[in-house]
């Protein structure tokens, strides 16, 4: 069929045919995950009693926004959380993570990055090196930072985590590979990191950066030892439809604590209008399991094709996928931090 629209060489068409054949079993597995998550989503919408009126937002202060509260109820049910903040005011994953960290930590507390250095946009938030200097980083507010590097094989150093967790207040786990060529951590690994830290320090809060990982499996990190998770609706849970926003979900007391940093101390979750965003947010979230499945199938196809032409992607197409990211070495020596400098993103 594709040759009716594009002038492709026979060798390319044969490569496409072979790639699709090799990916068949993996596609079927991803579709099983999709179907499970879609049924979970449908049950959440049904049990929470979502009605057409809940697609209408609010203006002004947004006090007593029943539709916003209904969205957070559905999200909590679907993700296995006691409570959640799902708001269009979150501008990116980094912004959402920042609100969560500033909400959980106080002066004198320690943030432990248990899975190595977080991706570079968080360096400015934490205050690593010169990043964010003078802008109100965690360290400038008296919060200590500790880090356990990954082992050479990109697996967590559990012995070091157990030692460093003794003095930690919050343990940070980054599920996705971010901008490194490691595999995303599966839920068993997240559970083991959480158990290791909690055994050393029962009072520690396990915080998982869930960006790029939602709906890639039938469970979420809250069922694997996490106390709080956070992510962006610009990515997986927005289904490519939700125009903006993010979420923080988990234990009710911790979400409540964070909500007072999201708005203002003493106000918490009660404030925040939704304007015209709710219909697209409900819609995007509902379709997210299917959209994530298609993103993963595209990734698997690309990974398989790259392997057939001699390039080694991370992960391999046969691997268990725990985020939607694919890495491969293009042979270029150019290296940009995120976000890419503006002069490098303009079309020429």
In which residue ranges do the predicted regions lie?
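Short glycine/threonine-rich loop-to-helix capping motif typified by GTGT followed
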Residues: 326-335
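Conserved PLP-enzyme active-site core in the AAT-like
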Residues: 5-9, 15-17, 23-24, 31, ...
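Conserved glycine-rich beta-strand-loop-beta hairpin in the small C-terminal domain of fold type I
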Residues: 318-326
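Basic/polar N-terminal segments that are highly enriched at the extreme N-terminus
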Residues: 1-3
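Conserved small/polar residues in nucleotide/adenosyl-binding loops
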Residues: 336-345
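Generic structural marker for isolated residues within well-ordered, non-membrane alpha-helices
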Residues: 72
């Amino acid at each position: 069929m594709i040759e009716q629209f594009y002038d492709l060489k026979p060798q390319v068409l044969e490569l496409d045919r072979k790639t699709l054949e090799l990916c068949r079993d993996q596609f079927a597995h991803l579709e099983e995950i999709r179907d499970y998550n879609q049924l979970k989503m449908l049950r959440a919408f049904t049990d929470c009693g979502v009605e057409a009126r809940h697609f209408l937002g609010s203006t002004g202060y947004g006090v007593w926004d029943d539709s916003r509260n209904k969205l957070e109820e559905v999200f909590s049910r679907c993700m296995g959380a006691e409570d959640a903040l799902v708001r269009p005011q979150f501008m990116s994953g980094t912004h959402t993570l920042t609100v969560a960290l500033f909400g959980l930590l106080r002066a004198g507390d320690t943030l432990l990055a248990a899975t190595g250095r977080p991706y570079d946009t968080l360096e400015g938030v934490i205050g690593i090196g010169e990043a964010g200097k003078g802008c109100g980083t965690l360290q400038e507010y008296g919060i200590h930072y500790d880090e356990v590097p990954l082992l050479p094989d990109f697996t967590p150093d559990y012995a070091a985590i157990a030692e460093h967790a003794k003095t930690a207040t919050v343990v940070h786990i980054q599920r996705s590979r971010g901008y490194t060529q490691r595999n995303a951590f599966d839920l068993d690994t997240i559970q083991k990191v959480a158990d290791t830290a909690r055994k050393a320090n029962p009072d520690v809060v396990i915080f998982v950066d869930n960006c790029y990982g939602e709906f890639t499996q039938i469970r979420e990190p809250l069922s694997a030892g996490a106390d709080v998770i956070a992510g962006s609706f610009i990515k997986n849970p927005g289904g490519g439809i939700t125009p903006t926003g993010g979420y923080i979900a988990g234990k009710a007391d911790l979400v409540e604590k964070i909500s007072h940093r999201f708005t203002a101390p003493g106000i918490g979750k009660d404030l925040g209008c939704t304007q015209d965003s709710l219909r697209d947010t409900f819609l995007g979230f509902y379709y997210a399991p299917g959209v994530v499945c298609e993103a993963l199938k595209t990734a698997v196809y690309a990974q398989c094709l790259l392997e057939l032409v001699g390039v080694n992607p991370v992960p391999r197409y046969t691997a268990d996928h725990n985020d939607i990211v694919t890495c491969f070495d293009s042979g270029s020596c150019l290296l940009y931090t995120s976000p890419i400098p503006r002069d490098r993103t303009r079309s020429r």
